[in-house]
């Protein structure tokens, strides 16, 4: 029950007609244009950071409802097609707007987190997610706190799952992050702190010790 109220709450940022469309899609997906629904969700995710982190739950509910109602996957197919388009244009998006780029990464990672096939993450999303995270680990992105913050947040959410899908790529990603932390001189103090925290987080088996948690939490809030 808690989930449905959260979904309703997240839909409030849309106009009333779109809210109605989404509410219907959540309950009766066969009666609405699911291509339009997927476009609406992606469009909003690219401009609304809070929604981009929560949209996976709504997409998951619609996918489940459609499978149950018609045994179909129209919504998922349209969603993944649109994600593929946005993914291909990611560098242009990043140049145009850091905020839109960060929203795109959050959204792709959120879909990876929520949309499962037989309780496993979708293999088709593993490399796109890694590609986004590798882009955030490049030296020009590590200078930007907004991008570092996004990178660390995604690794907190899905790092463990992602590593299980491809440990070699995770090792390569963390080699980049370690080099950035040790060798890059133009990091902000907050960027450096966030990188140190995520390095420790993975080293601890994707969790922080109580002591480390208290330390980082106090540093971030100060």
UniProtKB/Swiss-Prot annotation:
GO molecular function terms listed in the Swiss-Prot or TrEMBL record: identical protein binding; RNA binding; translation activator activity
Any GO BP annotation: cap-dependent translational initiation
InterPro entries, A to Z: ARM-type_fold, MIF4G-like_typ-3, mRNA_TranslReg/HistoneTransl
Superkingdom as given in the UniProt entry: Eukaryota
Keyword Transit peptide: no
Compartment(s) of residence: Cytoplasm; Nucleus
One Pfam family named in its UniProt record: MIF4G
Keywords: Cytoplasm, Nucleus, Translation regulation
MIF4G domain mapped to chain residues: 3-205
GO CC aspect terms: cytoplasm; cytosol; histone mRNA stem-loop binding complex; nucleus
Function noted in UniProt: Functions in replication-dependent translation of histone mRNAs which differ from other eukaryotic mRNAs in that they do not end with a poly-A tail but a stem-loop. May participate in circularizing those mRNAs specifically enhancing their translation.
Assembly behavior: Interacts with eif4g1, eif4g2 and slbp; probably tethered by SLBP to the 3'-end of mRNAs ending with the histone stem-loop, it also interacts with eif4g1 which is bound to their 5'-end.
Similarity comment: family membership: Belongs to the MIF4GD family.
PANTHER family linked: EIF4G DOMAIN PROTEIN (PTHR23254), MIF4G DOMAIN-CONTAINING PROTEIN (PTHR23254:SF17)
Protein name: MIF4G domain-containing protein B
């Amino acid at each position: 029950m808690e989930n449905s109220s959260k979904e309703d709450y997240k839909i409030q940022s849309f106009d009333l007609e779109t809210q109605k469309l989404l509410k219907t899609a959540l309950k009766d997906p066969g009666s609405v244009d699911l291509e339009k629904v997927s476009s609406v969700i992606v469009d909003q995710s690219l401009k609304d950071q809070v929604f981009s982190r929560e949209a996976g739950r709504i997409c998951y509910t619609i996918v489940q409802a459609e499978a149950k109602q018609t045994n179909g996957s129209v919504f998922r197919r349209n969603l993944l097609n649109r994600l593929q388009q946005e993914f291909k244009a990611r560098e242009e998006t990043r140049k145009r707007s850091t905020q839109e780029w960060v929203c795109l990464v959050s959204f792709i990672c959120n879909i990876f987190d929520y949309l499962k096939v037989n309780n496993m993450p979708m293999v088709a999303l593993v490399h796109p997610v890694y590609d986004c995270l590798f882009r955030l680990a490049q030296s020009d992105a590590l200078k930007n706190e907004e991008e570092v913050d996004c990178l660390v947040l995604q690794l907190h959410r899905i790092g463990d799952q992602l590593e299980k899908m491809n440990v070699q790529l995770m090792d390569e990603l963390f080699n980049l992050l370690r080099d950035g932390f040790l060798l890059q001189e133009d990091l902000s103090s907050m960027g450096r702190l966030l990188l140190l925290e995520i390095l420790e987080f993975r080293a601890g088996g994707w969790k922080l010790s109580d002591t480390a948690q208290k330390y980082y939490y106090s540093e971030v809030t100060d």
